[in-house]
Amino acid sequence: MAIPQIKTQVGTSKQAGDAAEESALRHLQQAGLRLLQRNYRTPGRGGGEIDLIMRAPDGTTVFVEVRQRANASHGGAAASISVTKQRRIIFAARHYLMRLREPPPCRFDVVTLECGVIQWLQAAFEAC
């Protein structure tokens, strides 16, 4: 008896996420930001990840979370960034900044992609 194979969307979801990140990167670069690092992760379990770390023309370090949704149901892409997710991003940002001799001014931006439309939310949340 043949066992039916179950198709997962892991590869498809990962590819869609990578494509969204690439679109966000191009959008930010066209706006004058420069890429410092991609997919920065803190070591160990329970840490955080930052999709893109950019430098704005004024010298501000910009930590960017990229979110993509096929449609705006369940609140859309921006609404999917929970307080817990924000804390993890802030944790990773602090970890990144500790490596620098003199930390620059920074902010947390979100780039959403919904139905092919890019929206850039500058200073979307703050580190308390």
Swiss-Prot record:
Pfam families referenced in this protein's UniProt entry, alphabetically: UPF0102
Region of interest called Disordered, as start-end residue ranges on this chain: 1-20
Coiled coil: none
Gene3D superfamilies per UniProt: 3.40.1350.10
GO molecular function terms attached to this record: nucleic acid binding
Sequence similarity: Belongs to the UPF0102 family.
InterPro entries: Restrct_endonuc-II-like (IPR011335), tRNA_endonuc-like_dom_sf (IPR011856), UPF0102_YraN-like (IPR003509)
Upper lineage: Bacteria, Pseudomonadati, Pseudomonadota, Betaproteobacteria, Burkholderiales
Name listed for the protein in its UniProt record: UPF0102 protein Rfer_3873
Organism encoding this protein: Albidiferax ferrireducens (strain ATCC BAA-621 / DSM 15236 / T118) (Rhodoferax ferrireducens)
